[in-house]
């Protein structure tokens, strides 16, 4: 049966998956955004529902002023003895342009009730540094030993080559304390200079080591190794590495970072990341959705005790697998702010210091009290973001904002990072209120508002991003500017683009708090 890929569109990279009974649970990276690590649920591998996040409290996650691409990387989810475990790491400093990184200490959180996000524990930190942590519980069942694998730079660089030298290391750990109980050993390095995303499983008499190699851009690929001895190796390279290879001219690119799951019928599957660029004439345009890397699903078969993923073929947008079916995620989504808590799927940039919003002070409105940081500051602004998951759609909100200071603003934003964003909002000067459109490149433009009505703000998404507003019921849309998709995806001068495009709501003051609230009546994609 054929089905559509990606199965979880938009900014959802580095998938990790586990099955408990008939239920599948999948998690992805969140980088510098809060809450951290979304948890998706499915019973058929096709329709996935966001059911919560693993890191929702300041006692679990403190992400403050990291560069774009910092924060929480590539978590792994596992289940053992009635307990769900999630392993991850959080970069507080990430400046690859200067080869300046602080290797984070990994950690894990756990719960017995994955449906209640408040039950996840505070983190237990590992002694071992690195990223892409994985703990396999296969070995706990055999001799009580737990192995932790992670990625960091080799102690001794490769002589004569300018490589990243990111390699897979493994050590034993005391899970209760996180303390290492053995020295780490290097078990896999790559000629590309990057071996990461390690997952170790046991099947039959073999242990299998899966690694993502070549970096997460055009050279990305997935490799496999096996050992009859144990997780320390020796490791035998698979006969058909990489397990598949998508190139820079394919409809799906940058594929890799796979994790495996077996369904209740004995079928095996792999989830992995990929991007969907759009063809524009003779060139590819970076995907506003998939540059953040999306979650794909493909079949896995075992032949001669080696895994064969997707039949060894390239990953495509239409895939085949037993028992699956065609499904398209709907464009329409709306939040009327009618509940006492924010809907799942809203994100903050960084961990907020204070409570700067309310859903109860004015029922049926999201009330924001803008904090002292504008959107260009690395700190956490008063801003709520949602992932764009369809290339062609319209984002819309209705705003009531009557500022008393010339140094405050509220509106809606097209967001990539604090270097690259485009906003349309309400401000005031001595003559009254006006609309300001600030594109990601170029100068701001302003349009006078003649009355005190609520303002509808919108962003049309497609071949470009177009920004407009309506003043009052029945007013025509005033389209006041646009931003090319290329400009919206501009690479930052520091950090990296690991996320896809997001849209959001904000209120801000220039080094001061907004004393007047901004009230949003709704937010929607349509």
Please provide the spans of the model-predicted regions.
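Carbohydrate-active catalytic/glycan-binding domains of CAZyme proteins
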Residues: 1-526
